[in-house]
């Protein structure tokens, strides 16, 4: 929002017109005077924002977008993951005082991207890790799956400290800990078909015949809602939502116990975002997954996570049940982060709020 506030200020100072391209209708309500809806290369609707929100869209597709954006998520109930049986079990994942630093060569300074973070996740629990860009969320996730080495601390998975393990020692656990990456198009090999991409992780598991492997791939496509006709498609032939689903299918192919979802709803339009949220929630229920959701999408957090942890400058500043954090955050930064979610309502239209500029101060 700081960037948008600055954009509005400069546009006013210089007398500029601005075209804002976005999926976020809250952003449209707060910053725009008119809204245009595009579909399949065509401009299907153009209206003043206040009329669009008050009188409603004239096109069915536009109405679907607005309705999807206004749906209040069904909160996850922390009690589901907090029953006596689960509370008596040791955590599936326990992180203690984790530290990861990076050296900036240009000025020889050291950045503590993850700075003494401790958290735990039990079986069947889902934790959302939120915070602004650069807070250390993705670095944290990469440390958990050993994509990058940690400097110090402890990462215990199923009772084993994975931090000192070599790649070979960690390999047997890699099947049980999977990650869905933020940018699926970058993570997916462009020369492989969907069939090949989903089949590749199966090599980490028990040996399978070609027939069993082919059947498992189709089963996974069904599970994540991808048409079997797309099995021979390449990543560039898929929509962003379909690419996300392929990434999820790859992660689930080896039947993991724990999955890290890095920005699972980023860069998706409102309808597809809702579909991905529903898919992930259904998969959690069906498979009993433990999960870490790394996200900026606070609206989706309420549907996806039992608990929320807030990161800032590499540190964990607040942690608790999702509804308690949303209804009564204890930390000032958390309150500002929640306030930065833009409502889809008429009063914000065209008024160009600038109260969010203080977020990083």
PLM region descriptions:
Residues 46-48, 316-320:
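ABC ATPase "signature
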Residues 153-161, 173:
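Conserved ABC transporter NBD signature motif
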Residues 211-229, 339:
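Conserved ABC ATPase "signature" region
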Residues 234-238, 242:
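Conserved ABC ATPase signature
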């Amino acid at each position: 929002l700081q960037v948008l506030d600055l954009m509005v200020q400069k546009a006013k100072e210089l007398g500029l017109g601005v075209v804002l391209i976005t999926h976020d209708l809250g952003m449209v309500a707060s910053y725009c005077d008119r809204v245009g809806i595009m579909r399949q290369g065509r401009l299907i609707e153009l209206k003043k924002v206040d009329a669009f929100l008050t009188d409603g869209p004239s096109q069915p597709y536009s109405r679907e977008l607005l309705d999807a954006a206004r749906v209040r998520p069904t909160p996850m109930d922390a009690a589901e993951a907090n029953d006596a049986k689960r509370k008596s079990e040791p955590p599936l994942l326990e992180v203690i005082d984790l530290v990861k630093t990076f050296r900036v060569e240009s000025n020889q300074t050291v950045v503590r991207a993850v700075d003494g973070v401790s958290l735990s996740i039990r079986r069947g629990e889902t934790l959302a890790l939120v915070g602004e860009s650069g807070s250390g969320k993705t670095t944290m996730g990469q440390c958990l799956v050993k994509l990058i080495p940690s400097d110090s601390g402890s990462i215990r998975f199923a009772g084993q400290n994975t931090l000192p393990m070599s790649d070979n020692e960690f390999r047997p656990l890699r099947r049980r800990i999977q990650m869905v990456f933020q940018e699926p198009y970058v993570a997916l090999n462009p020369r492989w078909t969907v069939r090949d991409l989903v089949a590749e992780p199966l090599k980490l598991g028990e040996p399978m015949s070609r027939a069993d492997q082919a059947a498992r791939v189709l089963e996974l496509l069904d599970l994540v809602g991808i048409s079997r006709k797309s099995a021979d498609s390449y990543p560039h032939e898929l929509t962003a939502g379909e690419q996300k689903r392929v990434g999820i299918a790859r992660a689930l192919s080896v039947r993991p116990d724990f999955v890290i979802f890095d920005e699972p709803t980023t860069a998706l339009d409102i309808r597809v975002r809702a579909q991905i949220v529903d898919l992930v929630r259904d998969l959690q229920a069906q498979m009993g997954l433990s999960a870490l959701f790394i996200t900026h999408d606070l609206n989706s957090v309420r549907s996806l996570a039992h608990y929320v942890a807030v990161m800032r400058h590499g540190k964990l500043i607040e942690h608790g049940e999702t509804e308690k954090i949303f209804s009564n955050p204890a930390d000032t930064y958390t309150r500002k982060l929640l306030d930065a979610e833009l409502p889809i309502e008429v009063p914000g239209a065209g008024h160009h709020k600038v109260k969010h500029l203080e977020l990083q101060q």
